Amino acid sequence: QQWAVGHFM
């Protein structure tokens, strides 16, 4: 889940 990197960060 690379989207999580920009979503939580």
Swiss-Prot record:
Tissue: Expressed by the skin glands.
Entries under PROSITE patterns matching the protein: BOMBESIN
TM helices/strands, residue ranges: none
Cellular compartments annotated: Secreted
Amino-acid biosynthesis keyword on record: no
Post-translational modification Pyrrolidone carboxylic acid, affected residues: 1
Alphabetic keyword roster: Amidation, Amphibian defense peptide, Pyrrolidone carboxylic acid, Secreted
InterPro entries: Bombesin
One GO term (biological process): defense response
In-chain residues carrying the UniProt-annotated modification Methionine amide: 9
GO cellular component assignments: extracellular region
Family: Belongs to the bombesin/neuromedin-B/ranatensin family.
Name of the protein in its database record: Litorin
Organism: Ranoidea aurea (Green and golden bell frog)
Lineage: Eukaryota, Metazoa, Chordata, Craniata, Vertebrata
